[in-house]
Structure formats: C-alpha cells, structure tokens
C-alpha cells in the first residue's frame, strides 16, 4: 500500500479551501485504510467504516487514490468472496468507468472475483455492470481485456444473466477476443461463449455474432482448455437442425477436426468431440461424413475405454451413425459387434445399454447377412440373459432388436432354439405398452414360415399362460395395433399346417369368439364407409382366420 501512503501528499493546491477540505478527508481515509489493512484478517471491508474509507478514495479526483482503492478491492476480493450489496458494488462499478488502465484492470479483477458468488452475479448485471465490461473488452490493454472477459464468463454461468448478456452486445467482442494472441484472454473468451450455448435463443444470437467460424478454427488450438470450450460449444450449437445446416454449408473441415480430437490426450476433450459428432450425426450427411473421415477407429477405441463418460459419448455417437443403411457394413467390419454386445452386460448404466442395443438393432436393419452377424456376436443370448432384469427402457430396445432379427427367415429356427419364447411371452404382460408391443411383434415375426411349429405347441400354455394367454390379452385389449399384431400372428399359426397347433387354436373358445367379434364389428358398421385401411386390414385378417378355422360361414349368418 505504498501508493496509498504517498498519495496523501498528492499534488493538490493548498490555496483553495475546498480542495484542502477534500485533501483532509482523503488523508483521514488513507490513514484509516492503512490501519484496517494492517489488521485485514479481522476487518470487514464490505461495510461500515472500512467501506466508507475505500469509497472516499474511489470518488476522489486523485488518480493515485483511485488506483489504491481499486488495488485494495482487487486484493481483498481475492481472499474474501461473499454476497455483497450495492454499497460495495457501486464503487467498484464506478471505478470500471475510469479512463486509467491500472484502475480498470484492478476494478475488473475485483468484480470478476465477486462474480464467483451466485447472488453477486445477478446484482452486478442488475446494477448495469455489463456495459462498462463490454467497453473494457475493447480496451487495447490485454490485462484489462482478460479481466473483463473473465468477469463476463463468471456472470454468464447464471441462467438469469444469459439472455441479458446475449442481448447486451457482448457476443461480438467476445467472438473477436476468442482469437486473441494472449492465451488467457482466449480461454476466458471461449469459456464465455460456451456459457452462452445453453438455450436456443442464445445459440442463435451467438451464430448471428459470427461465432461459428471462430469456434471451428480454434478446434485446432494447442491449448486443451480452448479445445474443450470450443468443442463443447459446437456440440451444443449442433443440437439445432438449422445450425447443423449452417455448419454443413460453411464448415467443411469440422468433422475432420472433431475426429482428430477424439484422439486427444485429454479425456474431457475426447468426450466432447464424440458428443459433438453424435449431435451432428442427427443428420444423414454427417452420418456418412464421419465414416468417410475415418471416425470409426477412434470411436471404437473410446468404446473400449474403461472411463464411463468416454464409453457413453462413443456409443451414443455410433448409435446415430448406425442409423444410415450405408454405414451398417462399415461399422460391423470395423469390429464394433462384440464390444457392443459386451457393453450390454458390463455396465448398469441404462443409457449405455440402450445405445448399445439400439445400435445392434440398426446394424441388423437392412440385410439378412448383417442380422446373422449380429446373432453370431451373441446379441440375442445376452438379451435373453438380461432382459427380464434390466430397466423398462432397455427392455424396449432389446425386444425391438429381437423383433428385427426375427424378420430373417434364415434365423427364425436359430432364435427359437435359443429359447427366446422364455422371455418374449412374459414380456407381453409388461406394464410398458412399448415392451408389450415389441415382444408381440417379435412373436409375430417368429410365427411366419418357420417350418417346424412344435415349439409353438410346447409353449401354447406356458410360460405365463403361453402364446394362448398372449393372444387372448391382445385380442381383448381394444387396442387396434395390438389386435392387428395378434390376429396376424394367429393367421401365421393357422397357415402353418401343423395339425396339433391348429387344433389347440380351434379349442380356444375365447380366442375364436374374439376373432368373430372383430370380424363382425366391421361388417355391422360397413354402411357408414368410414373405416380406414388399417381397420379394414384387421377385419380381413380376422375373416381369413375364421375361414381357416372352418367358421367362415358365420359371415352370412350375421348379415342375414
């Protein structure tokens, strides 16, 4: 505090009484402040006499005293950060408007320190702190820039401030400072830009301010923090479809930069790079481009990591990439099948399990060859082992995957031999409508063109009331989709030419009666001609079932 001491004799004229009075007040304030600073550990500088002494220096016309005040605020806020009121913030905000570089630098440092506190974040903005900070961001002095940007970065972490900052005119200067040659300024600026990417409106303001090219360019920065901030910001920006289109039009190197960052030495950068690719891969163009940019190898390495966030980001990304039919074979050939199957049982993380099984289902979607490879990788055995114990969301994905595999005529016998009925039949009683529907769809797919229907006979009444119980429940459900699945399944069984199975169906009075009701319901309402195609198909299936049961004559009885 040598400056404070010497400033007592500052160059004011002793001739004017008014200036002498001010000088006396200033001398007293400096003397008091020196005393308080000697006992700083026990002194509260944010209220009472210590704050009054500081304020006297702040509002002095003596630049040395103003510098001393700003330096004191910077020093005390370095070690004492707590909620303060406008009596404390007012003098600091006043100092921000000062034209002196030293005063600006220390005042913005003090404000940045106080802006760590949640209550202070809101009050600083309410008291008009943004405009002087924006002005300081445009200072030619790097230290002033750094402190001002750091303060705005802290303010931008509070939800209440984000929209105000976005509309304040701060985004343009922040974007320019993100390109600063000073790494501290660059880090603070990119951190602030990241904090502005958590809402649709703010993201749009950021895009309008020209931040996208700067963020993409900085992906190649050598600084890990800058890489992280820019990768995460772009990941958030890519959540919006319009922004993805803009990125696709203007940022040709984005995918390659992100693929490179999945091999960063920093796990947090790797994680965000994979998540950014995942968000981009919501669009077909990017699904293909990531594979073309040799992104599969790095993603597979992340998938095999022992670090849960890396696994999650990688499997979420590969799930989106696997949506494109052209990517199915490249992903399989890259060696993803076994690791994906292993993920189903190696973690209790519901999200990872969902992404893994959904990816396996996508990979099996468009060719029997790929379905066979997914089956050979042990996917169905793993699902059968786990499906009754996993959360409902995972059950839904697992049963959907089995239903897709069951579309392959070549695999149906193999699936039946694996004992999938043991889990599919009980799951038609799940509390989840999705799980019920997927399980029934799988049963329906397995019932078509199997060849040997003996397993259907064995499972007619068990487990859990067997196929008979499932058909009963779905036909009685009143749900058009469920009835459609059940009637279609029943028709496949009746067309099987398996006498035992057909006999069991014929003896199931409840099932037969419901088939009649569904067929008759449509015929009785046929005069209004308002039935849609789906309803008509359900009725046609029901009538066909009755014909195969030798009860098709019931139609003329009802019409008569």
Swiss-Prot record:
GO terms for biological process: establishment of organelle localization; nucleus-vacuole junction assembly; pexophagy; piecemeal microautophagy of the nucleus; protein localization to membrane raft; protein localization to phagophore assembly site; protein-containing complex localization; ribophagy. It holds the Pfam family Arm. InterPro entries: ARM-like (IPR011989), ARM-type_fold (IPR016024), Armadillo (IPR000225), Vac8 (IPR045156). It comes from the Eukaryota. The keyword Membrane applies. A lipid is attached at residue 2 (N-myristoyl glycine). It is found in: Vacuole membrane. This is Vacuolar protein 8.
């Amino acid at each position: 505090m040598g400056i404070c001491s010497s400033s007592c004799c500052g160059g004011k004229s002793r001739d004017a009484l008014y200036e002498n009075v001010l000088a006396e007040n200033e001398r007293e304030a400096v003397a008091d402040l020196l005393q308080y600073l000697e006992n700083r550990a026990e002194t509260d500088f944010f209220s009472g006499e210590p704050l009054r002494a500081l304020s006297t220096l702040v509002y002095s016309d003596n630049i040395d005293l103003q510098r001393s005040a700003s330096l004191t605020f910077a020093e005390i806020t370095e070690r004492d950060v707590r909620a303060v009121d406008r009596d404390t913030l007012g003098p600091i905000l006043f100092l921000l408007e000062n034209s002196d570089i030293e005063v600006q630098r220390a005042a913005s440092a003090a404000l940045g320190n106080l802006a760590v506190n949640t209550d202070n974040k809101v009050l600083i903005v309410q008291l008009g702190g943004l405009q002087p900070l924006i002005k300081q961001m445009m200072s030619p002095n790097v230290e002033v820039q750094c402190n001002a940007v750091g303060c705005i970065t802290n303010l931008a972490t509070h939800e209440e401030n984000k929209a105000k900052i976005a509309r304040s005119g701060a985004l343009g200067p922040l974007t320019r400072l993100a390109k600063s040659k000073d790494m501290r300024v660059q880090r603070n600026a990119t951190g602030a830009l990241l904090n502005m990417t958590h809402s649709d409106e703010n993201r749009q303001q950021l895009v309008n301010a020209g931040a996208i090219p700067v963020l993409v360019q900085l992906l190649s920065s050598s600084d890990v923090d800058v890489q992280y901030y820019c990768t995460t910001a772009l990941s958030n920006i890519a959540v919006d479809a319009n922004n993805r289109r803009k990125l696709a039009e203007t940022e040709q190197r984005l995918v390659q930069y992100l693929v490179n960052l999945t091999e960063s030495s920093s796990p947090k950068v790797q994680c965000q790079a994979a998540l950014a690719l995942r968000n981009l891969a919501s669009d077909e163009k990017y699904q293909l481009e990531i594979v073309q940019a040799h992104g599969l190898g790095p993603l597979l390495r992340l998938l095999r990591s022992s670090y849960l966030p890396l696994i999650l980001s990688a499997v979420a990304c590969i799930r989106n990439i696997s949506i494109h039919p052209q990517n199915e074979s490249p992903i399989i050939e890259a060696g993803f099948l076994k690791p994906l199957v292993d993920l189903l049982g190696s973690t209790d993380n519901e999200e990872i399990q969902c992404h893994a099984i959904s990816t396996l289902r996508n990979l099996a979607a468009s060719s029997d060859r790929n379905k066979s490879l997914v089956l050979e990788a042990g996917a169905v055995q793993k699902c059968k082992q786990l499906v009754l114990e996993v959360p409902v969301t995972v059950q839904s994905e697992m049963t959907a995957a089995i239903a897709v595999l069951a579309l392959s005529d070549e695999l149906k016998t193999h699936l039946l031999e694996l004992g999938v009925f043991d889990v599919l039949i009980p799951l038609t009683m799940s509390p989840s409508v999705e799980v019920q529907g997927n399980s029934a769809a799988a049963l329906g797919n397995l019932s078509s063109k199997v060849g040997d229907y003996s397993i259907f006979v064995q499972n007619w009444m068990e487990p859990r009331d067997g196929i008979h119980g499932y058909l009963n429940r779905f036909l009685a459900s009143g749900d058009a989709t469920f009835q459609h699945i059940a009637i279609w399944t029943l028709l496949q069984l009746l067309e099987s030419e398996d006498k035992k199975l057909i006999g069991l169906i014929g003896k199931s009075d409840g099932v037969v009666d419901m088939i009649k009701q569904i067929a008759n319901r449509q015929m009785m309402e046929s005069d209004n001609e308002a039935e849609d195609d789906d309803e008509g198909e359900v009725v046609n299936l029901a009538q066909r079932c009755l014909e195969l049961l030798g009860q098709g004559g019931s139609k003329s009885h009802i019409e008569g």
